[in-house]
């Protein structure tokens, strides 16, 4: 039995690269989709916010000298490409997914309309939110917090490269320990970078817990959803 009825899964664009330097790694996206399918079969309603960093990052080197808002819009379009790839892979795996974009691209994806998104979730479809919040200067982490609050998700699952929040960078400090759980205030006081400040504040204000876990660890998503000790829970 899932511990959560409805979740918001935040996937970074980089997670889709696998071991590649750029783009979408086919084996990686298939494995991720199979993990999502596993939790939908348990009765969990799943919405996804996808990043675009595997294709373009508004804050990265390729955007140097570019107007920040323009670069951010390009990043949003990258998330639409990722969302389409994710939805197509889900279809091939026998799932039904709907892509909803915060920026209107009607010929390609439907616009984000909250009641429609809620209807899809209740029907057991996976909803993939693309184009971030639709506004420059906001990260896809903030989009995850916003959409999570809007759809009434019980938790935001932040899928990353590391299996939780650590007391220090585990790559640099062998003595770093993983927190099983930590409060929002404690994470702020210890300056732990769970999400960017805007996303973090939104989750805290809405009393929306965050679970940070590794998407590269097989079965981790299932263990998180069934309430096992996996990753780090950030709570009020």
From Swiss-Prot:
Pathway, per record: Pyrimidine metabolism; CTP biosynthesis via de novo pathway; UDP from UMP (UMPK route): step 1/1
GO molecular function: ATP binding; UMP kinase activity
Disulfide bonds: none
CDD domains: AAK_UMPK-PyrH-Ec (cd04254)
Role description: Catalyzes the reversible phosphorylation of UMP to UDP.
Family from the record: Belongs to the UMP kinase family.
Protein name per Swiss-Prot or TrEMBL: Uridylate kinase
Name of the gene: pyrH
């Amino acid at each position: 039995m899932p511990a959560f009825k409805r979740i918001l899964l935040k996937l970074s664009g980089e997670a889709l690269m696998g071991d590649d330097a750029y783009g979408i790694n086919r084996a990686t996206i298939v494995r991720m989709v199979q993990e999502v399918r596993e939790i939908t079969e348990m009765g969990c309603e799943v919405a996804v916010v996808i990043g675009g960093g595997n294709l373009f990052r508004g804050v990265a080197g390729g955007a140097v000298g570019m107007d920040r808002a323009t670069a951010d819009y390009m990043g949003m379009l990258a998330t639409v490409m990722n969302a389409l790839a994710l939805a197509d892979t889900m279809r091939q795996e026998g799932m039904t997914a709907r892509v909803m974009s915060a920026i209107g691209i009607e010929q390609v994806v439907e616009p984000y309309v909250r009641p429609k998104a809620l209807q899809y979730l209740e029907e057991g479809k996976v909803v993939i939110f693309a184009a971030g919040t639709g506004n420059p200067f906001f990260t896809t982490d903030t989009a995850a917090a916003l959409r999570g609050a809007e759809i009434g998700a019980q938790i935001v699952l932040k899928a990353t490269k590391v299996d939780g929040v650590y007391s220090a960078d585990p790559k640099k400090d062998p003595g770093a320990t993983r927190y099983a759980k930590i409060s929002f205030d404690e994470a702020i006081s210890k300056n732990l970078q769970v999400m960017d400040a805007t996303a973090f504040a939104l989750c805290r204000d809405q009393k929306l817990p965050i679970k940070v876990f590794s998407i590269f660890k097989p079965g981790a998503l299932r263990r998180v959803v069934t309430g096992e000790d996996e990753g780090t829970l950030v709570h009020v």
